[in-house]
């Protein structure tokens, strides 16, 4: 049975009232709420150390998987449990071997974009031998580096494996279920008005996150992010959401205050979408929706907050390289 952490609908009028009256306290409460969700996962792991030798952490794009995996690692180490993190992004196939879509573009959302044989081999080595060598994918060159990184996983320690396809049976079927804990992290709440009408869908909240992150850290314009978005969503529906049911625990990574935090930056970015763009109507709809939220300054977001994964300034990343620091 899956344990679900987090609620489904968020009332905009309450969000705006709190953002207007006490923005800093609102931010703090939202952050504390997520930390408590992470703490519940840690308590579950702590009580099931043998079963949790490998934590498979999945979820769609811009869900906060990476920071959540690092928070889990940090929390485990505070409890005296040795932990390592593994990013499935390091197991991408070389660019030229990535499957193609019918239009000739590369299908980076498919599980078949990964070197599945290598990934399974690495995970099985960790389970049975307690050691392995991890690749590093060079995104600039579109291939893995020649050098690998040796890691060990002694008895009583935990590996947190994070990636879009971490719950896909293609990857997990040969791993001993007695050693696995399966997590699914995603934004799972819509923002609604007093009449129950949806203002922002959960998927649109993730689009805001991704647009801001891609612009600031991946050199991607809002137009380009929107160009990719339909393919990203198609990949979610085909390759990620069907396996949500396999999760032992699902975590809702939404922050009630995030439309208020993202509104100013996201509106400016979407305003760059020109009228002749095929994305113009979508951009204008999101701008209109964000315009109905009170705005809060990004400066009040704690450096340890998951949202820093998208706006920068996270204590979990090197400021100049965006590499993990824990």
PLM region spans:
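Glycine-rich phosphate-binding loop used to anchor ATP phosphates in small-molecule kinases
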Residues: 51, 120-177, 226-243
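Hydrophobic anchor at the beta1->P-loop junction of P-loop NTPases
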Residues: 55-57
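Conserved NTP phosphate-binding and transfer environment spanning the P-loop NTPase/kinase superfamily
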Residues: 23-28, 35, 172-326
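Conserved lysine of the Walker
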Residues: 65
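Conserved nucleotide-sensing/catalytic segment adjacent to the nucleotide-binding pocket
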Residues: 29, 84-86, 93-142, 158
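Post-Walker A helix-loop "phosphate-sensing" segment adjacent to the P-loop in P-loop NTPases
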Residues: 74-84
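Charged, amphipathic alpha-helical linker segments immediately N-terminal to NTP-binding catalytic cores
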Residues: 1-40
